[in-house]
Structure formats: C-alpha cells, structure tokens
C-alpha cells in the first residue's frame, strides 16, 4: 500500500513566518500561511504535485517510523484537533504503535511542527491511491494531499 517512502532529517530548524513572497503565493491559491516549514511543504505540493509532510522529530519516541494498519477504533487526533476512530484498513504512519499521520490524507496533531520545533523529519511518499481515497472517504476528510 506504500510503494515508496522517503524521509530526511533536518536539524537546526527555526520556525518563523514565511517570506511575503511565499505567503502571497499560498494566499493566491486559497491556502492560509502557517509557518515556514508547513508553508514550503504546501507550496511544493501545489507546484510539483508531490505531497510532503513534516513531523517534529523530537516527538517521535519509539525511534522508528512504521507504515501499517492499526486495530479497529484506534483513536487518532488530526492536525485540526479532531479525534477520529481508525478502521483496520486505514494505512497510517506510526511512531511504533502510535498513529502520527493518515497516510496520504492528513497529519496528526501530536507530531505537528510548532514554534518549539528544532528538528524535523520530512516525508515524501507514494501511497496506493485507492487506499488513500478509501481512507479519505471513510473519514470524510478531503485534503489537497488526498486527491
């Protein structure tokens, strides 16, 4: 269900507002600027068509990132702080057995980049589009990444 998963660790990150140029580009395509890291991932996705996701690496406690499914009804808190119950078919990116991201759909709140973030894990992946679509529809979550 995941044909390619690549990641890069970037240390010494300083979270700050994006440049006016990047903010204006995002606003022109209907996106709200958030911070330099999130904004550049959104801009890359819109300009190149490749979704990226940034995680705060210091929040990943198991020391390993896994792509898998979890038990039915496992609770996952999304970036917008909504709690959803996963189905046993939802592909997720995990910190051990803790869901960090709905694969190809939406990130998780607990691992999000914020003003205290110093190190990120930047993900670029290709997930099975049928799996992404099913997960997106199952939870009524439509994001630019899930198209």
Model-based region annotation:
Residues 1-147:
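RNA/tRNA-interacting regions in translation and RNA-turnover enzymes
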